[in-house]
């Protein structure tokens, strides 16, 4: 698919965050070419006046105003919430690198999330960040399933990226997101990667909006043995599977001294944060 790319002027790259673990968020782009079938960020079209399908366009943000050091000093900053800041267009436009060049002089807690090995291009800057975590999304070791779900870097490249970052002294997080019931084998992933991963994050698959029927249709055709389970969770709304899995993950990580955070109840965490504002 040919991407529609456009440069757009913005007043500020930094916005307040409703995410439970960050104060501010920076999205260098609007849109993303990864084409993740489960992407929650497709809701952004409502605010950007795009008629094109999500995954078919990318806006490259241009901002003449430097990032405010005073605003971010001592705060937590997330790159990025509704795009992959290292999507393939970053190689051409270098927005994320320019942002990092400003952030390295700010005493803030920086979290970068990506599915791309392109982040290794900026390892020189990453090593200058004093309080940095880099999370790479991996929810399967099956390349075919990954290819069915997104167009981002291969699983092999993502794992190599985590290992290279770890070897360079950068704090690594494997973000197991989204966890697909009956498909994501969290133990298998941990066993394979624990040597070079400092922390694991877990987030469950939420199905809503335009992509719900697409994913349920995929399960019906590719994994018919899981149809009953998905119907129980996503049609009937039974949370028992997630409650049981959360306990199981907690017990496994405790038994193996694995540092982790469970974001299964992300919606509840966001709502709790909003109530404190």
PLM region descriptions:
Residues 1-133, 141-144, 155-156, 167:
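Conserved Radical SAM active-site core
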Residues 152-164:
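Glycine-rich S-adenosyl-L-methionine
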Residues 2-9, 15-16, 187-277:
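Auxiliary Fe-S-binding modules of radical SAM enzymes
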Residues 76-78, 109-111, 131-135, 171-175, ...:
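Structural preference for beta-strand elements that scaffold enzyme active sites
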Residues 82-84, 115-117, 137-141, 177-179, ...:
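Active-site beta-loop-alpha junctions enriched in small/polar residues
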Residues 104, 166-167, 194, 254:
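Anion (oxyanion) recognition and catalysis
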